Amino acid sequence: MFTIITGAQFGDEGKGKIVDLLAEKYDIIARFQGGDNAGHTVKVGDKTYKLHLVPSGVLFDKRLLIGPGVVLNPKVLWEELQTLWGMGMKVDLGIDPKTSIIMPYHIEMDALREKARTAKIGTTRRGIGYAYIDKIAREEVQMADITDPEMLKRKLEEIAPAKESAIKEMGGDPSVVRDEAQLRAYLEIGRALKNNLTDVSLEINRALDEDKMVLAEGAQGAFLDVIHGTQKFVTSSFTTAGSACANLGVGPVRVDNVVGVVKAYITRVGEGPMPTELKDEIGDRLREAGGEYGTTTGRPRRCGWFDAVLGRKAVYLNGYTELALTKLDVLTGLRRIKICVAYELDGEILEYPPESTYELARCVPVYEEMEGWSESISEALDYSDLPQNARAYVERIQELMDVDIAAISVGPAREQTIYME
């Protein structure tokens, strides 16, 4: 069985917890895009694990794969592995040799470019975009290259002059391109991980041939997709379910399930339009109650009411077969709760978002109001344990999305999850 899991909003939907819940049933968990600009948090008992590159299934001693659609900072991965090993965890990790490497010059160029912008886009300055540019331009350093000094030397002889020139023009220090200490550190990590190299496409397809269970884990969310997101305020990779097939080298006919993770409200970190954003005390309350600060950057997330207009588009973009609704507990205590069911733009009612980011920024949300609930739901074990108003809210979201909700998260811990029949 091949299952894909993606975020249905702007990222930070709680995918880490949902993957962690599913991982126990799967043999392989594979990351298919993004880099360490995305973070996911998993809570088990009194321990919290913050991961950026290692797939969430690490807590169950599963086979973990990083596919060639990922851009990888070796130092970040190595630090994560050291932390996990220090906790006594076994990490059975495979990395595709074609995985693009985020080089120090990518990080430098990212910071210089963002500094020069008159209008910021909110990059994490981790070199993600520039690493993807090099992938498309066929000027990338790949994982295989940092396992062999001669391979890396030849690659840099080819691409370094242009990088040095570009950084100099941007006002930076071009010496970062061939910094010997940095390159030596990369090569040491590459040699240490050489035995972890694997053909990810081959491994997954063979596993599926043997009727094994494979879970493809996405990063970010639908509206950060480089094509279908809110350009230019997006990430540099393809975040929707279709990219799992392309990036992992698995034919689309092999997909069995696509799980969308959606928060009971909506958040966004960085710049870009978000029609239901709450710039008031309710937005502040959601941020504090939900702990809405970036796993990677620590930046406060912008919070807003649930947006079913974007939700409907996310369903189309991903082909969801089921949904996981997270952070329902954060809404506890609100007297009235709103759901955006349409937009108004220049006097016209829209039930589907406009393609233009400029027009989306001008959309005014059309809301339905629902009664809130005051009872704590964090210890609810069954759907019937939820207050009537909470159930009504869940059912309205399911109706608007037109996809069954299979699980509801009522707290950060694994056991704080309600499974629907």
Swiss-Prot record:
GO term, biological process aspect, one: IMP metabolic process
Assigned EC number: 6.3.4.4
Function: Plays an important role in the de novo pathway of purine nucleotide biosynthesis. Catalyzes the first committed step in the biosynthesis of AMP from IMP.
Active site: 12 (proton acceptor), 40 (proton donor)
Record-given protein name: Adenylosuccinate synthetase
Cofactor dependence: Mg(2+)
Catalytic activity of the protein: IMP + L-aspartate + GTP = N(6)-(1,2-dicarboxyethyl)-AMP + GDP + phosphate + 2 H(+)
Entry binding sites for substrate: 295-301
HAMAP family, A to Z: Adenylosucc_synth (MF_00011)
GO molecular function, one term: adenylosuccinate synthase activity
Encoding gene per record: purA
Localization per record: Cytoplasm
Chief localization: cytoplasm
Annotated positions binding GTP: 11-17, 39-41, 301, 327-329, 409-411
Record note on cofactor: Binds 1 Mg(2+) ion per subunit.
